[in-house]
Amino acid sequence: MKTFVLHIFIFALVAFASASRDSARKIGSQYDNYATCLAEHSLTEDDIFSIGEVSSGQHKTNHEDTELHKNGCVMQCLLEKDGLMSGADYDEEKMREDYIKETGAQPGDQRIEALNACMQETKDMEDKCDKSLLLVACVLAAEAVLADSNEGA
């Protein structure tokens, strides 16, 4: 029984460490063009918000509008280089396909519904940088809420 409890404890510790590491990671840093987009916008990794900061909404209260805009421009650059955006326009179908591939979501998955809602919420925004950051923030916040509700289930 002690071994079983120890295994549960270790599993919980690893899961917590993994979640903490993910929330500390910078938004967009998993993409191939991350360094290129940072350079194109004369930014360093220190200028980019963390996943945890964005998913919790803290980025909106802890940073100036110019920082928000610059982070959005990096996100737009990444989306455009991956063929998911052209200027301020989404390729919604490609965005869904890439999201499904990246997350392993299946048809009917609430994460896909959240992505669709986030694209709908931001689709009429004209500023491509602000639009991109709002989309990313919306999706990350929805994923955090869904993860919390699944943990409680």
Curated annotation (Swiss-Prot):
Impact reported for S42G: In allele b1, allele b2 and allele b'
Reported effect, A144S: In strain: AR-17f
Result, substituting A39T: In allele b1, allele b2 and allele b'
Effect noted on mutating T103S: In strain: Pu-8v
Recorded consequence of changing F16L: In strain: Pu-9f
Result after altering L68P: In strain: SC-670
Effect of H63R: In strain: Pu-39
Assigned GO CC terms: extracellular space
Function: Colony queen number, a major feature of social organization, is associated with worker genotype for Gp-9. Colonies are headed by either a single reproductive queen (monogyne form) or multiple queens (polygyne form). Differences in worker Gp-9 genotypes between social forms may cause differences in workers' abilities to recognize queens and regulate their numbers.
Family: Belongs to the PBP/GOBP family.
Protein name as it appears in the record: Pheromone-binding protein Gp-9
